[in-house]
Amino acid sequence: MSTFIFPGDSFPVDPTTPVKLGPGIYCDPNTQEIRPVNTGVLHVSAKGKSGVQTAYIDYSSKRYIPSVNDFVIGVIIGTFSDSYKVSLQNFSSSVSLSYMAFPNASKKNRPTLQVGDLVYARVCTAEKELEAEIECFDSTTGRDAGFGILEDGMIIDVNLNFARQLLFNNDFPLLKVLAAHTKFEVAIGLNGKIWVKCEELSNTLACYRTIMECCQKNDTAAFKDIAKRQFKEILTVKEE
């Protein structure tokens, strides 16, 4: 279901149905009332096997604003006595990553990250007047849940709308198109960053170029042809 919606509008989803909230939607912690906070197109996915729907607002914005439960990719830009300073987007405020925000972390057992390292994390706190905080584990289970340090691979900057489509829209074909050509690992950040890694560097480069071109053209019907051409060009250069 897709509906154009404004801030303050009623939320057109059955309140008795479990809903996973994405960007542009706020849940009042006191009343549990769900309401939109951005103007855009509301997308509500069909129920999955777990019976949970996913809802998010697709709105136009070039600046990323951290929101609780957002998946993000950050770059370590500084270290302090008890936390790391992380950049989520150029020319935007940094966020904080505690030394304890990792699986099984303790004062004696904590990860050692260097400036320039990439991390995949979840936004755990985001207050207007305070620095946002991220964590590299699932606080409900204590496990990494796919979060942590991103080693090797390539990082791609895309627009925020493209990242939201890739993460939330199950019908968005890009990942299936790439999977038809190679095996790969991917991390998608709602801050407009995508990390991709393949066993061979040539395939990683082909994935990088495919994602970049698909983001620029944003024509889902052309994704297959774009991927086919990019992988063919990389393979030709490799053979030469």
From Swiss-Prot:
Presence of keyword Metal-binding: no
One GO molecular-function entry: manganese ion binding
Species assigned in the record: Saccharomyces cerevisiae (strain ATCC 204508 / S288c) (Baker's yeast)
Record localization: Cytoplasm; Nucleus, Nucleolus
InterPro entries found in the cross-reference section: Exosome_RNA_bind1/RRP40/RRP4 (IPR026699), KH_dom_type_1 (IPR004088), KH_dom_type_1_sf (IPR036612), NA-bd_OB-fold (IPR012340), RRP40_KH-I (IPR049469), Rrp40_N_euk (IPR041054), Rrp40_S1 (IPR037319)
Additional record remark: Present with 6050 molecules/cell in log phase SD medium.
GO biological process: CUT catabolic process; exonucleolytic trimming to generate mature 3'-end of 5.8S rRNA from tricistronic rRNA transcript (SSU-rRNA, 5.8S rRNA, LSU-rRNA); nuclear polyadenylation-dependent rRNA catabolic process; nuclear-transcribed mRNA catabolic process; poly(A)-dependent snoRNA 3'-end processing; RNA catabolic process; RNA processing; TRAMP-dependent tRNA surveillance pathway
Assembly mode: Component of the RNA exosome complex. Specifically part of the catalytically inactive RNA exosome core complex (Exo-9) which may associate with the catalytic subunits RRP6 and DIS3 in cytoplasmic- and nuclear-specific RNA exosome complex forms. Exo-9 is formed by a hexameric base ring of RNase PH domain-containing subunits and a cap ring consisting of CSL4, RRP4 and RRP40.
Single GO cellular component term: cytoplasmic exosome (RNase complex)
Family per similarity comment: Belongs to the RRP40 family.
Keywords annotated in UniProt: Cytoplasm, Exosome, Nucleus, RNA-binding, rRNA processing
Functional note: Non-catalytic component of the RNA exosome complex which has 3'->5' exoribonuclease activity and participates in a multitude of cellular RNA processing and degradation events. In the nucleus, the RNA exosome complex is involved in proper maturation of stable RNA species such as rRNA, snRNA and snoRNA, in the elimination of RNA processing by-products and non-coding 'pervasive' transcripts, such as antisense RNA species and cryptic unstable transcripts (CUTs), and of mRNAs with processing defects, thereby limiting or excluding their export to the cytoplasm.
Lineage: Eukaryota, Fungi, Dikarya, Ascomycota, Saccharomycotina
Superkingdom of source: Eukaryota
Domain S1 motif: 67-137
Designated name of the protein: Exosome complex component RRP40
